[in-house]
From Swiss-Prot:
Keywords: Cell wall biogenesis/degradation, Glycoprotein, Glycosyltransferase, Golgi apparatus, Membrane, Signal-anchor, Transferase, Transmembrane, Transmembrane helix. One of its GO terms (cellular component) is Golgi membrane. Glycans are attached at N203. This is Probable galacturonosyltransferase-like 6. InterPro entries: Glyco_trans_8 (IPR002495), Glycosyltrans_8_dom-fam (IPR050748), Nucleotide-diphossugar_trans (IPR029044). Pathway: Glycan metabolism; pectin biosynthesis. The lineage of its organism: Eukaryota, Viridiplantae, Streptophyta, Embryophyta, Tracheophyta. Pfam families: Glyco_transf_8. It is found in: Golgi apparatus membrane. Residues 22-346 are lumenal.
Length: 346
């Protein structure tokens, strides 16, 4: 199969990069990024131009654009830059991809300048997300990263993005795309609000506490539907239907209940499961080879799931840039390396 041959070549090249780069350094903290006299990232090496078959693209409201939303923060910035780079490298029409970056207010100017220095011709807007929007709704989680306000920004895309943007692909920062993103964009949602790869054989009960399942007023929310697990790091969202149905308020309602009753442990995921599980347009699993970051505690190494691959996702506690810099990489981290634009000699 072509995808196997392609991945074998990519894997070999990436392993060579790791072996030949012994001086990998840890990604700098926010203070270092703000005070650095030289660029933290290299400029993207390629000029990304549309092919002849691509439609002309203009401003954010142009109907021919593919809209992609990603959060930006200094802790995961290296991952976000790699994700954007991967999308551009594999897009047939890279100039037709419009990026919507969500960042906390005090970092937007810094991050906007940085993105423009790496991708000078990139079409994007950056949006302020006020942490106060969700701070009073967030409860403690199994991993501190899951408690960060920006992790909840995906619930507010319908409010943050321009009203003319009626559909968006939401992507986490710890992934790379190895296929044309337009294929994911064209996914039919039918009557559904969101589309995502579903995993109906997963143990759904573990995502909620025993107290949740013992209370009919909570567990009854799944009556009449077949709930399946889905990972919220890769979603196609119909923003027009989301706005019309007030789905942000529905998610906030469950977050308020969680603050009082403690019905789950996993950050921003369970409210999405409560609102949408059983009502998700299924997308091929090739678009979210998730779990490559291991579990939420140890971050152990994982293998690829069987089948073709269009997107690699390091969900879990282990991130490829951290493991690479600490010289304790997992084998599959080599597949992330070709998209990394961080200046290792910095």
């Amino acid at each position: 199969m072509l995808w196997i041959t392609r991945f074998a070549g990519l894997f070999s090249a990436a392993m060579a990069v790791i072996v030949l780069s012994p001086s990998l350094q840890s990604f700098p903290p926010a203070a270092a990024i703000r005070s650095s006299p030289s660029p933290i990232f290299r400029k993207a090496p390629a000029v990304f131009n549309n092919g002849d078959e691509c439609l002309s693209s203009g401003g954010v409201c142009n109907p021919s654009l593919v809209h992609v939303a990603i959060t930006l923060d200094v802790e995961y910035l290296r991952g976000s830059i790699a994700a954007v780079n991967s999308i551009l490298q594999h897009s047939v029409c890279p100039e037709s991809v419009f990026f919507h970056f969500i960042a906390v207010s005090e970092e937007t100017n810094l991050l906007e300048s940085l993105v423009r220095s790496v991708f000078p011709r990139l079409k994007f807007n950056i949006y302020d997300f006020a942490p106060e929007t969700v701070r009073g709704l967030i409860s403690s989680s199994v991993r501190q990263a899951l408690e960060q306000p920006l992790n909840y920004a995906r619930s507010y895309l319908a409010d943050l993005l321009e009203p003319c943007v009626n559909r968006v692909i939401y992507l986490d920062s710890d992934l790379v795309v190895v296929d044309d993103i337009a294929k994911l964009w064209k996914t039919s949602l039918g009557s559904r609000i969101i589309g995502a790869p579903e995993y109906c054989h997963a143990n759904f009960t573990k995502y909620f506490t025993g107290g949740f399942w013992s209370e009919e007023r909570f567990s009854g929310t799944f009556r009449g539907r077949k709930p399946c697990y889905f990972n919220t790091g890769v979603m196609v969202i119909d923003l027009k239907k989301w706005r019309r149905g007030g789905y942000t308020k529905r998610i906030e309602k469950w977050m308020e209940i969680q603050r009082r009753e403690r019905i789950y442990e996993l950050g921003s995921l369970p409210p999405f499961l409560l609102v949408f599980s059983g009502h998700v347009a299924p997308i091929s699993h090739r678009w979210n080879q998730h779990g490559l970051g291991g579990d939420n505690v140890r971050g152990s190494c994982r293998d690829l799931h069987p089948g073709p691959v269009s997107l690699l996702h390091w969900s879990g506690s282990g991130k490829p840039w951290i493991r690479l810099d600490s010289k304790r990489p997992c084998p599959l981290d080599a597949l992330w390396t070709p998209y990394d634009l961080y200046r290792h000699s910095h």
